[in-house]
Amino acid sequence: MNTFRLESHLRDYLAQNLGLFSLPDAGLALYKSEDGTVRGVEFQTEVGPIDILAVAANGTLYVIELKVSRGADATVGQVLRYMGAVRKNVAKGRPVFGVIVAAALTEKLKMALSEVKGKVFAIEYELKVSLKQHGHEV
């Protein structure tokens, strides 16, 4: 098995390792409200919770939607809804992009993404674990 068992595990790992993302804008950090009370993990909107809301060093906002297994084409509509909510309530004129992270991208998802090229990015993740023996030889 090379996927996360629970979406919350993937979310927590990526929220702590936003530097792993290779996106057009550098310096991703978790979104924080101006008063610091709202964080970008499970960010609540009127259309549902966003897995991760991140902001780049230049202020660009990224709506990150996670799928622990295969990303379905319906995920594109979900991300677009979230992007609309962020644009309406948070962005204050800043650019908003979407990111779908999944263990595998289906052909239907790739087809749907072809219509929002440059606005929604898709990333496949791969889980790897390696162990190194140190200390006592057996």
Which role does the model predict for each range below?
Residues 1-138:
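Charged, terminal alpha-helix-loop-beta segments
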